[in-house]
């Protein structure tokens, strides 16, 4: 059902590899291409780990069957993609919060059995969306916290982002109902 569309995604990912910021980002894109070409879930895990551990790029992306919001059982995910770039000034402010994640975990108003003793690998940054695709289009949440895989999060951490230009757009759109007072 998705073969023709995913072939175009792979074609464009191969083109994008030439513009990767570094070898690590080329590896991430390569693993995603390999996953799309094989459908191998082990390769998807390798891609996810490489993606979550690649925290340096100014330009990043999410691409794949990521969120399962539309499936009540949480088993079937829909395809989505976002290409984004880092807002460096806003990220500096967010990194202060990220650096104190353990304090926030320890002092959160949550029952002790749900708290993590050792918060690991939280990479928080502020981004600006350049393009949205799939289930993210035409609008998306104001933040992303991935991967969804609990074992990957526990062993390799997660990426947590706030999408600044969408947050701003949603705030602006809430200032009125769109009608002129005449």
List the model feature ranges, each with a label:
Residues 1-182:
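Fold-level signature of zinc-dependent metallopeptidase catalytic domains
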């Amino acid at each position: 059902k998705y073969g023709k569309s995913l072939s175009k995604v792979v074609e464009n990912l191969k083109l994008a590899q030439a513009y990767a910021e570094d070898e690590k980002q080329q590896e991430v894109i390569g693993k995603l291409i390999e996953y799309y070409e094989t459908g191998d879930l082990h390769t998807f895990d390798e891609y996810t780990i490489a993606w979550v551990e690649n925290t340096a790029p100014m330009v990043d992306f999410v691409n794949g069957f990521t969120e399962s919001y539309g499936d009540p059982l949480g088993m079937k995910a829909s395809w989505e993609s976002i290409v984004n770039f880092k807002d460096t000034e806003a990220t500096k402010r967010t990194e202060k919060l990220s650096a104190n994640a353990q304090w926030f975990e320890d002092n959160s108003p949550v029952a002790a059995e749900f708290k993590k003793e050792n918060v690991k690998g939280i990479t928080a940054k502020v981004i600006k969306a350049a393009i949205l695709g799939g289930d993210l289009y035409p609008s998306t949440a104001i933040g992303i916290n991935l991967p969804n895989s609990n074992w990957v999060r526990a062993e390799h951490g997660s990426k947590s982002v706030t999408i600044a230009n969408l947050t701003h757009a949603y705030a602006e759109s809430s200032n009125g109902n769109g009608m002129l007072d005449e």
